[in-house]
């Protein structure tokens, strides 16, 4: 039936049109209504009469559907095939996978290497990519679920999977080149800026296996002591991954940029690049290499310590700042000369743009964090306790004193105290930030805008670690480690392409995976498919915050968040199927029509 709901949107009363049906959620329970399809607001339609005629036709077709008679044996067992749920949500991932023509690449690579085995590397690779999105786990645990995908060919064993990893590592570089070409052809690659960052992933092992092992102890981003591997990631201006490179865990972040950048430019035939990175990649060697290659850079710059002292005079000079009306933001923009080296190692004077700015919100946040650390330091000193946790001992200091007089002497007794001098010194830099760039024509807004794009690569790392469970890593061999991260890279690329297609309505990686994981079905007798409810999470009501952004409130709505997300995904892929019991031929046709336009 057609239901018209009067709702208030933007201060205006509108008529929300939807087709609903009645159902009984359980024996003895009152009937409820559920939405079959939502058509939007009547007042927003250019031709309301034609619009309602279309809704009525949909309603009639839905009501006129021939009822199905499904027979179920009274002695049917719980663990029979008819009662097995299989996922079909992976088909939306497969549409992007097919767009990238990964199967064709692997098949051609096998032919060129005359690689012949009894199992299908194509099937294994595809399965591992989809499992990484929907059920991220170890290779062993993932293979235990291989029969849970509708229509997917999974005729392989766990040993086949491990053997395939060696093969996958062989085409790590070539596949990334292929993916770049496919992205350029089908979506468009915007490399006006190349965003670069490095992270690392840990292994729950005690010791690496030798000098050649990628797993090394190094500076962990998560402050762990386990062996790690490092990953350098390039991303384009659309937020789509471009290139991934792996390094031993003890490699300094700053040493990864030049080899990765050279590989990207040589492999992809790129012209001038403007590299955007944080201060961890900002070194004189990197800057010299970038400029000598005819490329550009936008880096954040340390303003504390020896490396940042050159800016202290301008930073603490109260004149020359440009401020906003509220006094919550101010900046200085100027050019400076610096000493660089040409390709022959000869020194020369070069010029770059420097932006110093201060934000009150950042200053307030830095103050709060420091006060919290000082409280921890005071408790640590009081209890004479040490900690390996980050920040706990940042504001403590030690002195060797004479037990009798307190005079500082050699080798008698350690006295710990709160380092208030360091806290006062750090407070001077609260809220200040520095960006440097080779692009002399950039103004203040442009420099902040370009550097601000780095959040997308940071988000990509979070997706890989949190949503794709890229760590801890369970494989051991270098080839298997490279294959594992290649699979994670492609899973990330597929998610990013889906988000790119969604535009401003893009869902988070977690919600995409949750929704597609909930798209399950059962194959019944007589060529009937039972589609499970793609739902199960109550949506919260929305409201505008002080910044004019739409955010969740604490109040429940009458809608299902997963169901809404599934509709958005179907709309993105140009499909629409909400029948509970479609015939198998109709269902297969629906799956076949899931494509990326």
Where are these regions (language model features)?
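Anion-binding and metal-coordination hotspots
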Residues: 2-3, 16, 26, 103-597
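Conserved glycine(s) in the ABC-transporter nucleotide-binding domain "signature"
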Residues: 1-122
């Amino acid at each position: 039936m057609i239901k018209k709901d009067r709702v208030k949107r933007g201060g205006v009363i509108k008529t929300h049109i939807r087709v609903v049906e009645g159902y009984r959620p359980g024996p003895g329970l009152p009937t409820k209504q559920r939405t079959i399809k939502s058509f939007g607001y009547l007042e927003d339609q250019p031709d309301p009469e034609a619009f309602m005629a279309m809704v009525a036709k949909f309603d009639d077709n839905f009501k006129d559907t021939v009822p199905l008679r499904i027979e179920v044996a009274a002695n049917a067992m719980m663990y029979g095939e008819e009662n097995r749920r299989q996922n079909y949500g992976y088909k939306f991932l497969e549409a992007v996978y097919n767009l990238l023509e990964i199967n064709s690449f692997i098949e051609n690579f096998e032919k060129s290497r005359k690689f012949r085995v009894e199992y299908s590397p194509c099937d294994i690779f595809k399965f591992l990519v989809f499992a990484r999105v929907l059920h991220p786990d170890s290779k062993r645990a993932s293979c235990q679920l291989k029969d849970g995908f509708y229509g997917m060919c999974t005729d392989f064993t766990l040993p086949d999977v491990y053997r395939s990893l060696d093969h996958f590592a062989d085409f790590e570089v070539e596949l990334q080149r292929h993916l770049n070409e496919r992205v350029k052809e089908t979506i468009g690659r915007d490399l006006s800026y190349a965003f670069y960052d490095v992270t690392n992933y840990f292994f729950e092992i005690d010791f690496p296996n030798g000098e050649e092992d990628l797993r090394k102890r190094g500076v962990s981003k998560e402050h762990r002591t386990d062996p790690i591997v490092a990953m350098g990631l390039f991303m384009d201006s659309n937020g789509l991954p471009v290139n991934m490179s792996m390094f031993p865990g003890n490699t300094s972040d700053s040493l990864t940029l030049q080899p990765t950048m050279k590989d990207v430019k040589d492999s992809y035939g790129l012209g001038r690049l403007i590299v955007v990175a944080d201060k961890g990649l900002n070194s004189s060697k990197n800057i010299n290499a970038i400029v000598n290659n005819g490329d550009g850079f936008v880096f954040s710059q340390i303003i504390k310590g020896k490396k940042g002292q050159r800016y202290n005079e301008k930073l603490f000079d109260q004149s020359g700042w440009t401020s906003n009306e509220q006094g919550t933001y101010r900046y200085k923009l100027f050019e400076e000369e610096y000493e660089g080296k040409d390709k022959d190692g000869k020194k020369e004077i070069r010029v770059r743009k420097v932006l110093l700015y201060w934000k009150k919100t950042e200053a307030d946040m830095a103050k709060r964090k420091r006060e919290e650390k000082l409280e921890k330091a005071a408790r640590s000193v009081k209890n004479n306790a040490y900690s390996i946790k980050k920040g706990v001992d940042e504001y403590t200091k030690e002195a060797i004193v004479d037990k009798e007089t307190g005079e500082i002497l050699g080798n008698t007794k350690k006295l710990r105290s709160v380092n208030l001098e360091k806290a006062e010194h750090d407070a001077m830099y609260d809220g200040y930030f520095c960006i440097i760039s080779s692009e002399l024509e950039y103004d203040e807004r442009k420099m902040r805008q370009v550097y601000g794009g780095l959040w997308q690569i940071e988000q990509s790392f979070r997706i890989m670690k949190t949503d794709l469970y890229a760590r801890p890593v369970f494989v051991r061999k270098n080839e298997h480690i490279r294959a594992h991260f290649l699979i994670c890279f492609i899973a990330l690329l597929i998610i990013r392409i889906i988000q790119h297609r969604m535009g401003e309505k893009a869902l988070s990686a977690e919600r995409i995976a949750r929704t597609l994981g909930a798209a399950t079905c059962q194959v019944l007798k007589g060529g009937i498919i039972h589609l499970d409810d793609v739902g199960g999470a109550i949506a919260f009501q929305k409201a505008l915050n002080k910044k004019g952004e739409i955010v969740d409130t604490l109040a429940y709505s009458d809608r299902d968040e997963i169901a809404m997300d599934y509709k958005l995904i179907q709309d993105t892929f140009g499909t629409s199927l909400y029948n509970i019991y479609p015939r198998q031929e109709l269902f297969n046709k629906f799956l076949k029509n899931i494509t990326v336009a």
